[in-house]
Amino acid sequence: MSAVLCETRPVLDVEPLLHLERLTKRYPGVTALDELTVKVPRGRVGLVGANGAGKTTLFRLLLGLAHPTEGRVEVCGIDVAADPIAVRSRLGYMPEHDCLPLDQTAADVVATFGELSGLPARVSRQRASDILDLVGLDEARFRPIGGFSTGMRQRTKLAQALVGDPELVLLDEPTAGLDPLGREEMLALVARLGSFGISVLMATHLLDDVQQVCDHVLMIDAGRLVVSGATDSLLERTGRVTVDVGIAGDALAARLAEVPLRTVVVEGLVEVELDDDDQLDVLRDVIAELGLPLHRLSTRLTSLDEVFLDRARTAVEP
């Protein structure tokens, strides 16, 4: 099943997956990307932003389908403007919208994409069979795509993105239109790609999907960089602690505001936002200093939704 993908090139850590330098793209009356500067490591990367944030524009620039107004972009260490063909040969692309010929079989479509990537016809057909098996379409590969469900069409699009043995696969909203089971199955497939030496850049507005399968997050909003970082570190340094000190909640919140720590009192419980473990130690010291009874102290990691909203809100504040 996975023999062909196991032969993918080894992952090299010398060059980042993406290197953007003041990357800007303007259309008449609209700045789609605004001086993005960031290095993104290899692995499974979530490209996060609301509709209109600039995700599709970035994909077009990576694929060489559009040219930046200013700045530059490197993919896998190669300048897209200098050698777009070399970049494209290392990429697979799964578009958001349905673009499959409905009268053809999945096997024929995926094999055709393999040949377009430069594979000999016989090799392409064998790879198509293996990849369709990998994505769970082995028994359906000779059926016309017109009879496929939404989930099966999404899997076919993923298969055509993988058949050319890419170093990086661009996934544009891969779980769009899927039911809960189909979504979980698609995310499981995305999670497996790293074991084959394939990096992933997954564009989505569903932060739960990113939190589930991505080890790095690139957040953009209105064409500007909001945050870039390892998923775990983003969540770890944005923890929230709920403290129960009985009727003294307001007194504790007032003292913590002097430190200062960000707090909110909800039904007598004090919620404290912490950036690191040192601030947790400060919280404990303040409780001891005031001599308050500590009935409960529980830690909850914030979600990526909260991280995104907090960073986006901070970015627009004067």
Predicted segments with their positions:
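Conserved ABC transporter NBD signature motif
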Residues: 71-82, 87
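Catalytic Walker B motif of ABC-type/P-loop ATPase nucleotide-binding domains
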Residues: 169-173
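ABC transporter nucleotide-binding domain
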Residues: 185-274
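Short, charged/small-residue-rich alpha-helical element at the C-terminal edge
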Residues: 239-311, 318
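Helix-to-loop junction immediately C-terminal to a conserved catalytic motif
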Residues: 63
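Conserved ABC ATPase "signature" region
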Residues: 111, 115, 122-140
